[in-house]
Amino acid sequence: MRECISVHVGQAGVQIGNACWELYCLEHGIQPDGQMPSDKTIGTGDDSFNTFFSETGSGKHVPRAVYVDLEPTVVDEVRTGTYRQLFHPEQLITGKEDAANNYARGHYTIGKEIVDVVLDRIRKLSDQCTGLQGFLIFHSFGGGTGSGFTSLLMERLSVDYGKKSKLEFAVYPAPQVSTAVVEPYNSILTTHTTLEHSDCAFMVDNEAIYDICRRNLDIERPTYTNLNRLIGQIVSSITASLRFDGALNVELTEFQTNLVPYPRIHFPLVTYSPVISAEKAYHEQLTVAEITNTCFEPQNQMVKCDPRHGKYMACCLLYRGDVVPKDVNAAIAGIKTKRSIQFVDWCPTGFKVGINYQPPTVVPGGDLAKVQRAVCMLSNTTAIAEAWARLDHKFDLMYAKRAFVHWYVGEGMEEGEFSEAREDLAALEKDYEEVGLDSTEAEGGDGEEF
């Protein structure tokens, strides 16, 4: 078996986790108490969904997941909510005081008290696996727990499970909407620390998802539940090939191999289609060509940036539902001719395609329509550097005045860590810039210096 362990850190991680596990349970027909009427092989773990659920002797299916937050309120909602019987109480780990939007508290003072408990729990989960494939880590960049504790945990996971893949699903601070003033600090510190420990990071920004909810689903004032359900669909599409017997794309490492040309350039852009409300879906026939085309429109992306200004290095199209390879090939051929998609010249325009015949499931009473087919596109494009540049600029404005820095130093950080992290991100921006250069330009440029 190729099991995956999900780790949900901080408020964002936990709430996205709730949306994901709710959806997984619906997709696999698992009831909120963990029973699965359709599963006839009790206790034996050779079904595909066993990558995400472990089975107990009594036929209960338990998510291979850990929820961690440094303060209890958000996880308490899980402890008392609909799915309280799904999880083992030890999988829900909470501290007493929160990280107060402070990376240093999450990483140093408060985080280090709880990290061993979490690792111990993860060790127990990994002992139940026959062939652990890796970790999916859900968190936000802006919060104290999401940034500080995640980076601490990733460092420790690298030590304990050196070769296992670690994929992140991270909520990136939105360009306009902000939940904390110090988001740029936390984001840059956490990115710097986790850059070498993460194999692939899928970013979503709240503002982009707000806009999608407003525009496509006609929700005037989207709530976090609306956002998280949409994120849940995306995570479900990415992990569908791990949970169902799919035709293509089955390993976590396959994502990395196909999307990450250089270790540091591991931030693919995610697009999902169709996002459509039930009223509209009734009137529209969404063909493979149509949903594939919508994936290349900037307004359907999960991070605000413009891929028309960047170049593609790699592109993965993960289809699910009623899709046949013939249609996919036709759709891709159409895109290559019609769209001005620019690939870097050192990468032939290959699209990696995954097809899963399980149609997308929706949460009953949710906003999304039940559709026959959907696609999730993961593309590694140099345009995402815009997002980093935006963040770095905000960091610089605050750091020039050393605003708020004393809160971090007071928790045991050194000011040098800020400048070190900032330099690392400057290097990351530069990396993206260089990757986008044509190979001829790059080689020619080097020659002139001497």
Curated annotation (Swiss-Prot):
EC number: 3.6.5.-
Catalyzed reactions: GTP + H2O = GDP + phosphate + H(+)
Entry annotation: catalytic residues: 254
UniProt xrefs under PANTHER family: TUBULIN (PTHR11588)
Alphabetical list of SMART domains matching this protein: Tubulin, Tubulin_C
Modification type N6-acetyllysine: residues: 40
GO biological process: microtubule-based process
Keyword Hydrolase: yes
Family membership: Belongs to the tubulin family.
Self-association state and partner proteins as the record states: Dimer of alpha and beta chains. A typical microtubule is a hollow water-filled tube with an outer diameter of 25 nm and an inner diameter of 15 nM. Alpha-beta heterodimers associate head-to-tail to form protofilaments running lengthwise along the microtubule wall with the beta-tubulin subunit facing the microtubule plus end conferring a structural polarity. Microtubules usually have 13 protofilaments but different protofilament numbers can be found in some organisms and specialized cells.
Record-listed Mg(2+) binding positions: 71
InterPro entries: Alpha_tubulin, Tub_FtsZ_C, Tubulin, Tubulin/FtsZ-like_C, Tubulin/FtsZ_2-layer-sand-dom, Tubulin/FtsZ_GTPase_sf, Tubulin_C, Tubulin_CS
Cofactor(s) demanded: Mg(2+)
SUPFAM superfamilies documented for this protein: Tubulin C-terminal domain-like (SSF55307), Tubulin nucleotide-binding domain-like (SSF52490)
Cellular component GO terms held in the UniProt record: cytoplasm; microtubule
Binding-site residues for GTP, renumbered to this chain: 11, 71, 140, 144-145, 179, 206, 228
Keywords, comma-separated and alphabetical: Acetylation, Allergen, Cytoplasm, Cytoskeleton, GTP-binding, Hydrolase, Magnesium, Metal-binding, Microtubule, Nucleotide-binding
Job description of the protein: Tubulin is the major constituent of microtubules, a cylinder consisting of laterally associated linear protofilaments composed of alpha- and beta-tubulin heterodimers. Microtubules grow by the addition of GTP-tubulin dimers to the microtubule end, where a stabilizing cap forms. Below the cap, tubulin dimers are in GDP-bound state, owing to GTPase activity of alpha-tubulin.
Subcellular location: Cytoplasm, Cytoskeleton
Modification(s) after translation: Acetylation of alpha chains at Lys-40 stabilizes microtubules and affects affinity and processivity of microtubule motors. This modification has a role in multiple cellular functions, ranging from cell motility, cell cycle progression or cell differentiation to intracellular trafficking and signaling.
Superkingdom of origin: Eukaryota
GO molecular function terms attached to this record: GTP binding; hydrolase activity; metal ion binding; structural constituent of cytoskeleton
Protein name: Tubulin alpha chain
